[in-house]
Amino acid sequence: EFESLSSPSCFMGHNGHPSPCEHKYCGLGRHCVADHETGQGECRCLDYCKPHYKPVCGSDGKLYQNHCELHRASCLRGQKITIMHSEECFYKDDNCRLSDYRRLKTKVLDLHDKRYMGSKFHGAHGDNMAARKQLVDVMFRRFDANSNGQIDASELSQVIKQEGLSKDVSECTLFDLLKYNDVNDDEHLTKDEFYTALDVYLLTLPDDQKVSVTTATVGQSAVLTCAIAGERRPPVLWKRNHQYLNSLNLEDINDFGDDGSLYITKVTTTHMGNYTCHADGYEKLFQTHTLQVNVPPIIRVYPESQAREPGVTASLRCHAEGIPGPRLAWMKNGMDIASKLSKQLTLQANGSEVHISNVHFEDTGAYTCIARNDAGVDEDISSLFVEDSARKTLANILWREEGLGIGNMFYVFYEDGIKVIQPVACEIQRHIKPSEKLLALQVSSRANGILPRCVKATDKSRKQLLQRSKATVSTVDTDPYPVKLHYDKSHDQVWLLSWGDMEKNRPTLQVINQASGRVSHHTVHTQPIGRRFDRVDDFFIPASGLITNHIRFGLILHRNEPVLHKIDLETTSYVKNISLREYNCIPKSVSYTHLGGYYFVDCRPDSTGATRPQLVVDGVTDRVIGQNRDVTGTPYVSPDGRYLVSVDDGDGLMRIQMISERGEIQEPFDIHTNLHLSDLAFQRSFTEVHQYNVFGSSGRQTDALFVELRTGKVKMIKSLKEATKSPEWPWSSRNRPMAGSGLFGQYLMTPSRESLFILDGRLNKLNCEITDVVKGNVVVWVGES
């Protein structure tokens, strides 16, 4: 190693006599140099070493390219540096990141693949484990120069030298194989360790188990077991929508077990979807688990009881929700009516409605609707009494007096008070004037989910909330300028957003607890997020339904913040932030489906005015999954969670997406419209079971839009007069609302600037107009939900 560094002149004089250095030994890292003045030989440190790569660790903790460099450094520093027979210094000041390390391994594999494997096998190691193992076997035999079954640092240094794999390009070298994959720290790589380093895993997953389907019933627990097997299998990692679950510390998915199984303690419809498992470090071998969540049927009938005179028509309707979609059957007094069908007695809307024309006394009975699916059975009774009008039975009296109270009415709040309207006959049942303890009444721009026997309104000028129940009137003090109300049935709470002033400088959120109780009501402020109230722009609480009767969390939107603030509705306290910053999304509006637990977020336009696609947020992991394809606009979700309807006024588009019973969001189909849609309302189909239609109001034109969601069939309902102009209605971007009439409701209401229009949803036409109602832009249905 050192011979070539001593020139012949060191050993022979100019006259051919022996040099003064001929018999002088200077030691490692030094050489003899003749002093021409004295003629004596002197030992000096080597000027340089011959380039040679055989790295060695010094006792000073530094790594030297070879022994010569170590001894030369010892000489130059005047201190003893000995060779350390360990590789610790190989990794000192090592800036090799895991991503760089993976790229190095890929480079080494590709290099040896091209050099030693036949052309027909080139590249096969990328996704073929057998080909990868064959390549790594060839590499191990080559790396293991002394054929002792293991590879040490010296052998790695020779490969580095031969292949030119030093740190010229990357901070990583083959020495990092020892750093990351020498499991027992013996400074050697066994064949198994070499396999692990180069991702040759002797793990197995039978082909018939690559996809596993697990069905669970809502409310039960579920266990997903990873079928990847093998000796020394690394820990199992689980993903949902590309998000690792193991580190999230989720409340309902928090025990992964010794065998790597995924435990869901209480299954809900939000948990449905695909989960994947793989061994840590081996993402290419993964198993997909599809969790299907079944829900037993939950049934409602309408009406619960009715009295009819002979000769008229009677209808009994049934609605059931569940997963899979329930099958319906009817019984009369315990007997199947399927065998009794006739021209007089028919089943309509795919069996969800019993229609009896020209009723007779013998049609009196208890009609039981039965709903069945794979998860269970439910039933409910609708009673029909056929009686002469002269007979004042209790059933007759109850039937005839229904509607004389406050139920099954539209309540319209406007500048001249409140009008209570019965939609069937278009009758104004009552006009509550402002002088009736409601001076200068103005009301919330949108009152959502109002109590069945209770009406909530807000008086902006007096900062009060009115609660009206039959004959009683009470008021609740609120913050100034209340603009949005929402009744959360799950917790019997009313949530209230106030602006503080017209410039929205002092917005607040307040909650009224025990809202339907016979107690003294008052508002409670929610906990400010980040100790700031003045940023609140909006809030969103998912609507409860038949199979989603408990809503745990809501969202708060802050002005100009790319984040959703998650709140616990039970404690009205802040839980966490869901960041939208990666997508530069300032949330504008939100909707939600319980089928998979997805939030759909409409983003505000960017600084150039360009619209952004909606974001999809996973409600299980509280992470953004990504964009909802190229869908833009305000999202609306049908009450059963199976349709997402997005309205983009700028593009004149309504885009409809189905959401399957397994939580799969389908491709959109488009409906082009120039109506400038202001609001949407969903209504159950009168012709098909488990289907919904949607009605849309126009903010600028005099038509309304009807769409059959399953088929995309469109119809226009004309002559609804002009809406209140947007500048005249600053409380909401929806200057013409559209309100439905509950689960079994046939009618919808939408206002114009000076009138109210009632639409017949069964016939898809205008039912009537009620005039002289100026700016009746707050419409609430009170009755059967």
Describe every region a protein language model picked out.
Residues G742-S785:
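Blade-level signature of beta-propeller repeat domains, shared across WD40, Kelch, NHL, RCC1
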Residues I406-N408, A447-G449, S490-V494, I551-F553, ...:
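Short coil/turn segments that connect the beta-strands within blades of beta-propeller domains
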Residues G417-I421, A457-Q464, E503-V511, E561-K566, ...:
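Structural motif
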Residues V412, L451-R453, L496, I556, ...:
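Residue position within the beta-strands of beta-propeller blades
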Residues A34-H36, K50, E88-F143, A153, ...:
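Immunoglobulin-superfamily
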Residues E427-L439, S469-V476, R518-D537, S573-R581, ...:
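A short beta-strand motif characteristic of beta-propeller blades
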Residues R391-E401, E436-A447, D477-K489, P528-I547, ...:
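Repeated scaffold domains used in trafficking and secretory/extracellular systems
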Residues K62, D144-N148, N184-D186:
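Acidic carboxylate motifs that coordinate Ca2+ or other divalent cations, activating on Asp/Glu
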